[in-house]
Regions:
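Catalytic core of membrane glycerolipid acyltransferases/transacylases, capturing the structured
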Residues: 26-38, 42, 56-57, 70-126
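A membrane-cytosol interface segment of integral membrane proteins
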Residues: 119-140, 145
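Residue-level preference for the first positions of well-ordered beta-strands
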Residues: 72-74, 145-149, 177
Length: 249
């Protein structure tokens, strides 16, 4: 007769957080020692492996539907948690994120996110958004894939916040296709899991603990069909894409 031991929530969380810490430290060593000698394909492979490892360390299952469009693409991604970057990079390791500069202060994670080629925006500086849009356009012209959170901040999860249409301008200016990506974190009953919500006054440590104690957590990454952006009205396009993404949450 085979016995199954069910760990208490604090013990489960402790084991997961210990695994995450080891994984992050290993990632830092790889980035410092191996990244300089790797070509672009090698770096992308490492980013994908590391991102999937973050999810595994925290006990989060990964399910990917659809494929990323090849070539220059702007990815629109709904924003729920600090886990979003790991989830998308596990599915699309070559994507360059646009993220708030606050993440640079996250222990270990911030340094690794910077090393993955992330573009940072300082939201307190009104003109910084224009600088980032120009940087996004340069990356798209170079044939890269850029990922943005059009909501601008994390939401509760089941419903989308209004989209900031100005983030689409880089794609419109360069006639780059836009591909919506929907992240859905679910519990064992397939309902949205509130454990991942990183909103309000929740601290990073509190969010880490909630995720670490959650059982049967899964993230579903759905890559929808891309859409052309040339000569589009950015506000109308943003609202249309928001409606499309809402249908898949």
């Amino acid at each position: 007769m085979r016995l199954r031991l069910r760990l208490t929530a604090p013990l489960l969380a402790g084991l997961r957080l210990a695994r995450l810490s080891v994984h992050l430290l290993h990632g830092m060593a790889v980035m410092a020692l191996r990244f300089p000698s790797l070509n672009e394909a090698g770096r992308q492979a490492r980013i994908g492996w590391w991102s999937a490892g973050v999810l595994r360390a925290m006990g989060v299952g990964l399910h990917i539907t659809g494929t990323a469009r090849p070539g220059a693409t702007l990815l629109l991604v709904n924003h729920v948690s600090w886990l979003d970057i790991a989830a998308l990079h596990a599915a699309v390791p070559h994507a360059r994120f646009v993220s708030k500069a606050d993440v640079l202060r996250w222990p270990l994670l911030g340094w690794l996110i910077r090393g993955a080629g992330t573009l940072f925006i300082e939201r307190e500086r009104k003109r910084d958004a224009l600088r980032v849009v120009h940087a996004m356009a340069d990356a798209l012209r170079a044939g890269q894939t850029v990922a943005v959170f059009p909501e601008g901040t994390t939401g509760e999860g089941p419903e989308l916040l209004p989209f900031h249409a100005n983030l689409l301008q880089a794609a419109i200016a360069t006639a780059t296709p836009i591909q919506p990506v929907v992240l859905r974190f679910a519990d064992p009953t397939h309902r949205f899991s509130p454990a991942v919500a990183y909103v309000g006054d929740t601290t990073l440590l509190q969010s880490l603990w909630r995720v670490a104690t959650a059982r049967g957590l899964e993230v579903h990454v759905t890559l929808l069909m891309s859409r052309g952006s040339a000569h589009a009205d950015r506000r109308l396009l943003a609202e249309s894409l928001r409606s499309l993404m809402a249908e898949h949450l």
